[in-house]
C-alpha cells in the first residue's frame, strides 16, 4: 500500500507553475512510471495464499512448482520444483526443495519464473503466507493510459494537527476482499483539520513516523475511485503538519483486483467533495481501466 515518494529537482519546475504545483506534477509523473514497472501495481496478476497442513503442496495459477506452508514462526514458503521448471530463486536455478523467504524476512527472496514473470512472498497479520505473481507484460500494463487527476488546487493544502492516542483507539477495519468481516485495530491517533469550511477529525494508520490516511468523500464512486483514496501524512515533533490533498493517491486495488485494500472506516468518510488528487485509472481509450 505504501508508495515511493521522490522529490523534484529545480530542473523539474515547469514555467508558469508555482513550486508546490510543479512538485505535484513531478510526483504524478513518478507515479505513472512506478505503476507500470515490473513489480508495479499494474503488474500484479495473482495473489494466492498457501495455508493448511505444513508441507502440504499446492500448485499456484500461472506459475510452475508446488508450494507448501512452513512451520509456524518460519518466514516464507517451501517451493518444490525441477530444473525443467526454470524457476530461479536469488539467482539460483531451483532443482529440488527450497525455502523462499517472505518480505517480512531480513533478506526476502527474489523469484524469477521467466523474462517477464517474477514473484514475491508476503505475510498476513495471522502469519499466513502468499505468493504474489508479477507480470511485466500484463494486460493491465498494456492497456494502461493514464492516472486521471484533478487540476492542482492550492486550497486543498491545509494545516492539520496530529493527536496521539492517550490510551487506545480501536476502529473496525474492513477490507475490499473480505466484506462482511471486520478487524478491530488499535490506531495511533487522529488528525484534525478544516476543509470546505468544516472541521474534520480522521483516524490514521501505520507505525510512524509517517502515517497513512485512508478516506472517502462526496466524489467517491462518482468522479473518483469507488473504494476511496490514500494520503501520506508526516507530523512534526509537535504534531503539526500540512495536508496536501493534491497528493491524494489511488490505492493499489484501483490498478489490480489482486490487491486487498482497506476500506475507509466510517470516521474517515467526508460529506464534502475533495476535488484534488488522483481520480481514476484510465485505459488507452480513456475508459476506466477497471
List the predicted regions and their residue ranges.
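Actinobacteria-biased recognition of intrinsically disordered, low-complexity terminal regions
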Residues: 1-17, 288-290
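N-terminal cleavable signal peptides for secretion/export
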Residues: 13-64
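Long, compositionally biased interface segments
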Residues: 28-31, 234-290
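Forkhead-associated
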Residues: 52-105
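Short strand-coil-strand connectors
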Residues: 61-63, 90, 113-115, 194-198, ...
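Phosphate/adenylate-binding glycine loop and adjacent helical scaffold
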Residues: 91-94, 98-129, 142-143
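Surface-exposed beta-loop interaction hotspot
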Residues: 120-185
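Acidic/His-leaning functional-site neighborhoods
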Residues: 189-237, 246
